[in-house]
Amino acid sequence: ENRAVLEKSFIIPYIGEDLLNRLTEKDRFYALCAEVGVPVPRTVVFDASADGDDPATVTLPFPFPVVAKPASSAAYHYADFPGKQKVFFLRDATELRATLAAVQSSRYEGKLLIQETIPGDDTSMRILTTYSDRDGKVRFASFGQTLLEDMRPMGVGNPLAIASRTDETIVTEAARLLEAVGYTGFANFDIKLDERDGSFRFFEVNTRCGRNTYYMSLGGQNFVELIVREFLLGETIDY
């Protein structure tokens, strides 16, 4: 938002506000994934604003149980209502409608995503952290498998233990998405293995280093070093 002012005195190795919103607002992120052919869960978008969609009329093209989560985590942070959770796991239409109504009654005015459940426990989750240089080329990737996730209502999805792994197919998919939009800097993806057929679904991208980024350092690459080498020392980061 204040990039034009700040970059007069600081080096800012981050993307602009427009692209940030396009990637971090999950409904827009899924639309972008569809454009470039990156696989995501089947999703229905519900307008949770006060004069938005009617919870009673929502129909789904996939069976229960389903997952519901806010499109904008930043805006949802300020919403307060009984039973609030970071992610909702809903067994039937009654639970879905009650949840949609509860969210809609709060101060949250954004979209809510209703998604098919991708089966699998914590170990089905994958973490990918990438670094794209100032020209938008992905120069580094660190991939891991989640071993244990946070179970607290507002911490669901946060990995507590990660094991380093390798998967060039997923890295290639992520790089194709990032390079299509001219992304620069660090990106952190949440991805899940679909146990039914061995395919993967991209859940979201954080336009920053994740809270789990220290797993990169344990794997041999201090993530801060990449920014220092390119932006302060003028070096080229080779993949």
List each model region and its residues.
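A short, GP-enriched loop/loop-strand-helix hinge that lies immediately N-terminal to
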Residues: 1-24, 37-42
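Active-site nucleotide/adenylate-binding loops and adjacent lid/helix of ATP-dependent enzymes
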Residues: 22-113, 134-135, 168, 172
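A short glycine-rich, hydrophobically flanked beta-strand micro-motif that places a catalytic Asp/Glu
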Residues: 115-116, 184-196
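A short beta-strand motif that forms the metal-chelation/ATP-contact edge
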Residues: 198-208
